[in-house]
C-alpha cells in the first residue's frame, strides 16, 4: 500500500473516532486541567459568581452571632455598645435542670409516638412554665422562722386552663444533726399573710438527712384568680398535727416554737441557681398559630413594661422580625422562580414528602428558643395528576377535581399536594417575663402527604 493511501486511511480513521463521545471525552480529560479550571473561573466571573471551597466560604463569611440584626440595632440605646444589655435587664436566663429534664423526657416520648400530655407528671398540660424565686436573703442573724418565696406570675394568661401548680424547694443537707428527736418534723406551706394551709410534708428525724427536693402542691392558691405577684411562706414544726385545725398546728402539751429553717437546709445563702426555689405551673391552652401566640406575648410584655413591672427579656424578638418584609417577599419570589427553573422534570414527580430542615439559629430565634435549635419539619411537594394513588388518601373532591383537570387542564386546576398528618414537637423557650417555658406545639412536623 503506497504512502498517500496510508495517510488517507489514517485521516479517515481519526475523523471517525473523533465523532465518538468516549474518545472526545478522553481527549478533553487528557488535556491540561489548569486550562479547564481557568476556563471555569472565567465563566464564573462572567456570571458574577466565584467558586469557593466550604472552608473558604465559612472563613469568608462573618459569623451570624457576631452580626447585628436589624431589630437588635433598633433596640440599642444611645451610648450602648453592641452586645451590652440595656439597663434594667438581667443576665441571660439559665434554664433550670428540672425544665431541661422535662424537655428531654417529652421529646424522646414524641419520637416514640407518645403524646407528652399522657404523662402523669405533665398533668395533661401542653404548657409548663417555671418561675424562679425572686425573694432576697434574710441577712439578720436571728432564727429564720418563716421563709418567704416571691414569684412574678404576671405572664400567666387567664385564657389558659390551669391544671396544676407545684412549688419545688431544694433542701440542703443540714449543717448540724437534728438531735435525738422522736417526734415527726412537719414542713408547712401557706400563702403569705394567710392561715390557709396549702400543703405539708413530714420528715423523719431518725431518717437520713440527705439533700433533696421537697414538692408542695400550690394549685389551690393559683386557681381562684390570676395573680401578678405570688408570695408563699414555709414553716417547720415538731409534733403531731391537729387535722381539725385549719392552720394545722401541733397539738398536745409538747408544743414547741417554729424551727430555724436555716438549720433544716432551707436558707438562701450560698445557694447556686440550680438550687433556687422553683414554681412550676401546668396549663392547657387551645391550639394557636405560633406567630399569633408570640405576638400576644409581645403585647403582654409591652403592657407589663408600661406598668413598671420587670422588663421583657433581651431574647424576645421584635414583631417586625417575624413578619415577611417586602424585601423578604421579593427574595422568596426570586428563589421560588429559580427553584422552578432548576427542577424542570423533577418538579413533575408525584406528590410525596420531602426533607425540610429548620434551623432556628438561622431564623434569628436562637436568642429566645433554648431547644431544639434545629429540627426536621419536612414538606409536601409534587403533582397530583390522574390517576391518583390510594396512598395519597385523596378526598372525593380531589378525585373529581383531578379527573376534570385531566380532561381539560385549562378549565380546572389540579388538586394540591398538602400535609395530611402533622405531629407536634416540644420547644423550650424564654417568654416575655424571662421565664423558661416548655410547650408542645402542634402541627410542626409533616408525617404524610396527600392530594386535596
Curated annotation (Swiss-Prot):
Prodomain positions: 23-332
Disordered: region residues: 29-93, 244-267, 301-348
InterPro entries: Cystine-knot_cytokine, TGF-b_C, TGF-b_propeptide, TGF-beta-rel, TGFb_CS
Biased segments, Low complexity type: 301-317
Compositionally biased tracts (Basic residues): 327-348
Keywords annotated in UniProt: Apoptosis, Cleavage on pair of basic residues, Cytokine, Developmental protein, Disulfide bond, Glycoprotein, Growth factor, Secreted, Signal
Molecular function GO terms recorded: cytokine activity; growth factor activity; identical protein binding
Organism domain of life: Eukaryota
Keyword Nucleotidyltransferase: no
Localisation: Secreted
PROSITE patterns listed in its UniProt record: TGF_BETA_1, TGF_BETA_2
Annotated glycosylation sites: 115
A single GO cellular-component term on record: extracellular space
SMART domains for the chain: TGFB
Similarity comment text for this entry: Belongs to the TGF-beta family.
Function: Growth factor that controls proliferation and cellular differentiation in the retina and bone formation. Plays a key role in regulating apoptosis during retinal development. Establishes dorsal-ventral positional information in the retina and controls the formation of the retinotectal map. Required for normal formation of bones and joints in the limbs, skull, digits and axial skeleton. Plays a key role in establishing boundaries between skeletal elements during development. Regulation of GDF6 expression seems to be a mechanism for evolving species-specific changes in skeletal structures.
Protein name, entry field: Growth/differentiation factor 6
Organism: Rattus norvegicus
Highest classification ranks of the organism: Eukaryota, Metazoa, Chordata, Craniata, Vertebrata
Amino acid at each position: 500500500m503506497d504512502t498517500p493511501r496510508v495517510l488517507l486511511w489514517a485521516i479517515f480513521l481519526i475523523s471517525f473516532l473523533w465523532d465518538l463521545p468516549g474518545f472526545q471525552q478522553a481527549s478533553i480529560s487528557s488535556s491540561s486541567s489548569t486550562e479547564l479550571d481557568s476556563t471555569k473561573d472565567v465563566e464564573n466571573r462572567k456570571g458574577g459568581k466565584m467558586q469557593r471551597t466550604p472552608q473558604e466560604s465559612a472563613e469568608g463569611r462573618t459569623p451570624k452571632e457576631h452580626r447585628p440584626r436589624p431589630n437588635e440595632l433598633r433596640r440599642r440605646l444611645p451610648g450602648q455598645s453592641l452586645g451590652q444589655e440595656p439597663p434594667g435587664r438581667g443576665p441571660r436566663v439559665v434554664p433550670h435542670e428540672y425544665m431541661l429534664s422535662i424537655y428531654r423526657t417529652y421529646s424522646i416520648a414524641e419520637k416514640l409516638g407518645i403524646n407528652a400530655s399522657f404523662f402523669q407528671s405533665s398533668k395533661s398540660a401542653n404548657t409548663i412554665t417555671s418561675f424562679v424565686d425572686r425573694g432576697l436573703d434574710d441577712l439578720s442573724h436571728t432564727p429564720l422562722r418563716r421563709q418567704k418565696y416571691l414569684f412574678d406570675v404576671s405572664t400567666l394568661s387567664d385564657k389558659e386552663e390551669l391544671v396544676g401548680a407545684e412549688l419545688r424547694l431544694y433542701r440542703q443537707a443540714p449543717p448540724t444533726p437534728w438531735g435525738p428527736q422522736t417526734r415527726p418534723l412537719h414542713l408547712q406551706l401557706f400563702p403569705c399573710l394567710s392561715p390557709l394551709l396549702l400543703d405539708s410534708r413530714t420528715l423523719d428525724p431518725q431518717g437520713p438527712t440527705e439533700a433533696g427536693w421537697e414538692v408542695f402542691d400550690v394549685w389551690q392558691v393559683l386557681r381562684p384568680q390570676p395573680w401578678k405577684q405570688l408570695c408563699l411562706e414555709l414553716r417547720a414544726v415538731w409534733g403531731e398535727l391537729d387535722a381539725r385545725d385549719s392552720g394545722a398546728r401541733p397539738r398536745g402539751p409538747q408544743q414547741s416554737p417554729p424551727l430555724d429553717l436555716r438549720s433544716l437546709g432551707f436558707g438562701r445563702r450560698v445557694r447556686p441557681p440550680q438550687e433556687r426555689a422553683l414554681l412550676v405551673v401546668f396549663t392547657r391552652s387551645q391550639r394557636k398559630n405560633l406567630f399569633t401566640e408570640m405576638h400576644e406575648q409581645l403585647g403582654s410584655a409591652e403592657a407589663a413594661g408600661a406598668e413598671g413591672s420587670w422588663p421583657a427579656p433581651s431574647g424576645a424578638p421584635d414583631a417586625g422580625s417575624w413578619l415577611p418584609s417586602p424585601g423578604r417577599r421579593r427574595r422568596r419570589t426570586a428563589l421560588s422562580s429559580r427553584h422552578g427553573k432548576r427542577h424542570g422534570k423533577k418538579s413533575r414527580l408525584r406528590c410525596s414528602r420531602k426533607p425540610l430542615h429548620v434551623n432556628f439559629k438561622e431564623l434569628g430565634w436562637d436568642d429566645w428558643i433554648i431547644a431544639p435549635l434545629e429540627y426536621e419539619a419536612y414538606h409536601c411537594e409534587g403533582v397530583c395528576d390522574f390517576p391518583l394513588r390510594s396512598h395519597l388518601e385523596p378526598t372525593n373532591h380531589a378525585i373529581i377535581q383531578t379527573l376534570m383537570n385531566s380532561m381539560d387542564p385549562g378549565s380546572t386546576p389540579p388538586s394540591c399536594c398538602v400535609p395530611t398528618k402533622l405531629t407536634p414537637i416540644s420547644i423550650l423557650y424564654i417568654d416575655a417575663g424571662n421565664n423558661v417555658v416548655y410547650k408542645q406545639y402542634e402541627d410542626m412536623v409533616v408525617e404524610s402527604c396527600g392530594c386535596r
